[in-house]
From Swiss-Prot:
Family in the record: Belongs to the chaperonin (HSP60) family.
Function: Together with its co-chaperonin GroES, plays an essential role in assisting protein folding. The GroEL-GroES system forms a nano-cage that allows encapsulation of the non-native substrate proteins and provides a physical environment optimized to promote and accelerate protein folding.
Subcellular location per the Swiss-Prot or TrEMBL entry: Cytoplasm
Protein name as it appears in the record: Chaperonin GroEL 1
Organism, scientific name: Erythrobacter litoralis (strain HTCC2594)
Major site of localization recorded for this protein: cytoplasm
This protein's UniProt keywords: ATP-binding, Chaperone, Cytoplasm, Isomerase, Nucleotide-binding
Gene: groEL1
Cellular component per GO, a single term: cytoplasm
Enzyme class label: isomerase
SUPFAM superfamilies linked to this entry: GroEL apical domain-like, GroEL equatorial domain-like, GroEL-intermediate domain like
Source organism superkingdom: Bacteria
Length: 539
């Protein structure tokens, strides 16, 4: 086991505080509409230019191991905030730095760190209640666009696209962000359920211009196993032909004689038919086929469930208004499923999302919810250079998360003003002792930090602006750093999602409390490089 170096008490906290300051000072310059850029060196390719706080935080690694511990704990604030709300990482970092600085001073002055932590927790709980009581629900398309525009650092095109995407696929829908191959940013939406399996044979194509299979009002056969011959299906196929409706077959695979028979029937015009492979693999495939069955009011034909192909009747097939298949994807539009059944299935998948520990599983489950409950939208981000595209993609990702958060918990005035206005809620707060009261005062001072930093990044005197704002009583009245005006921030579109502000404060206080109550640091000593022994000399 390698030898360790141990630091105690104020020496430990001072080292960590240096690391916290290094990381926070690099991150906080990006805060606000007039935030500065940070240029990050890459081991290959062009350097990366960003205004995204979490991207900067993730790149910082310090040489001194003890300082690095402080920086890494602060990086944890940014990462947590990014995972929970997708935005507000810089605000969380600024708040954490302010709480740690004040807390370290208080501990150095002889106060009890545990009581300080209790005071901080008490104050944060009170502020969170105040924020929740002032949050305004978001529903209008224009308000959603405003939130998205702010999170994308004032890019109105992104705001408009995101509002449009959420309008089309709903809050549950999947919105993915990709890099475009062109200069323009564009939005593509898919209504209904789409899965990444194309037609099994180009002979199924009905629209030769677009090379797509388009089936109007088809029956849908959902089969779990491979189909290699159609003998068992002949009675069912005859019923489908008599109904005059097309047929879509979804199975693990359709091969050999079965595929040849279907193609021949399609070409002769006897049966309008198409076949695709089932989506997913293993247990996920079974679950996705069940999703398709519920969406289309059909049954999965599976021997595990006791149904055999020869016993399938036309009533066991799914129905949909339209099915569109290209060489890569199948889209089922407007399935005939019962809304109550679909809602029950969505609730069931949501329960699985709550309990799963795997990020990959969670992502796949969320996609399934979206396909059942909403739709899928893809925003393709364009730009003149690779660096520009990457930077814009970061901003669109931020804006997407922030917009979702706004719809979830409502909005507050932006520019750090909601935290400033929350100072009033701490006025009547009484602590059990003086040290806890100091904890409350630490939060009181920290709440001013984001508004001050936004003003300073815009080239203004932060302390003066915060003082001026605290003179007024109007909750929404604040300093618009983009224009340099004092105005009603909600009316002028400077808004923050309540969830972003709330989680920023909670995560910052959580990590800052850990740093304040740290009494010892342990790190490995660097290994001494022993020179290699000289080879023996042969005389």
């Amino acid at each position: 086991m390698a030898a360790k170096e141990v630091k105690f008490a104020s020496d430990a906290r001072d080292r960590m505080l240096r690391g916290v300051d290094t990381l926070a000072n690099a991150v906080k310059v990006t805060l606000g509409p007039k935030g500065r850029n940070v240029v990050i060196e890459k081991s290959f390719g062009a350097p990366r230019i960003t205004k995204d706080g979490v991207t900067v935080a993730k790149e910082i690694e310090l040489k001194d191991k003890f300082e690095n511990m402080g920086a890494q704990m602060l990086r944890e604030v940014a990462s947590k905030q990014n995972d929970k709300a997708g935005d507000g990482t810089t605000t969380a970092t600024v708040l954490a730095q302010a709480i740690v600085r004040e807390g370290a001073k208080a501990v150095a002055a002889g106060m009890n760190p545990i009581d300080l932590k209790r005071g901080i927790d008490l104050a944060v709980g009170t502020v969170v209640k105040d924020l929740e009581s002032h949050a305004k629900k978001v529903s209008a398309n224009s308000e959603i666009a405003q939130v998205a525009t702010i999170s994308a650092n004032g890019d109105e095109t992104v705001g408009r696209f995101l509002a449009e995407a959420m309008d089309k696929v709903g809050n549950e829908g999947v919105i993915t962000v990709e890099e475009a191959k062109s200069l323009e940013t564009e939005l593509e939406t898919v209504e209904g359920m789409q899965f990444d399996r194309g037609y099994l044979s180009p002979y199924f194509v009905t629209n030769t211009e677009k090379l797509k299979v388009e089936l109007e009002d088809p029956y849908i056969l959902i089969h779990e196993k491979k189909l290699s011959n159609l003998q068992a299906l002949i009675p069912l196929l005859e019923q489908v032909v008599q109904s005059g409706k097309p047929l879509l077959i979804i199975a693990e695979d359709v091969e050999g004689e079965a595929l040849a028979t279907l193609v021949v029937n399609k070409l002769r015009g006897g049966l309008k038919v198409a076949a695709v492979k089932a989506p997913g693999f293993g247990d996920r495939r079974k679950a996705m086929l069940e999703d398709v069955a519920i969406l289309t009011a059909g049954n999965v034909v599976s021997e595990e469930l006791g149904t055999k192909l020869e016993n399938v009747t036309i009533g066991m097939l799914g129905r949909a208004k339209k099915v569109i298949i290209d060489k890569d994807n199948t889209t089922i539009v407007d399935g005939a499923g019962n809304k109550a059944d679909i809602d029950a299935r969505v609730s069931q998948i949501r329960a699985q999302i709550e309990t799963t520990t795997s990020d990959y599983d969670r992502e796949k489950l969320q996609e399934r919810v979206a396909k059942l409950a909403g739709g899928v939208a893809v925003i393709r981000v364009g730009g003149a250079t690779e660096v520009e595209v990457k930077e814009r993609k970061d901003r669109v990702d931020d804006a997407l998360h922030a917009t979702r958060a706004a719809v979830e918990e409502g909005i507050l005035p932006g520019g750090g003003i909601a935290l400033l206005r929350a100072l009033k809620s701490l006025d009547g707060l009484k602590a059990a002792n003086d040290d806890q009261q100091s904890g409350i005062d630490i939060v009181r001072r920290a709440l001013r930090a984001p508004a001050r930093q936004i003003a300073e990044n815009a080239g203004e005197d932060g302390a003066y602006i915060v003082g001026k704002l605290l003179e007024g009583d109007d909750y929404n009245h604040g300093f618009n750093a983009a224009t340099g005006e004092y105005e009603d921030l909600v009316k002028s579109g400077v808004i923050d999602p309540a969830k972003v502000v709330r989680t920023a404060l909670q995560d910052a206080a959580s990590v800052a409390s850990l740093l304040i109550t740290t009494e010892a640091l342990v790190a490995e000593l660097p290994k001494e490089d022993t020179p290699a022994p000289m080879p023996a000399m042969d005389f």
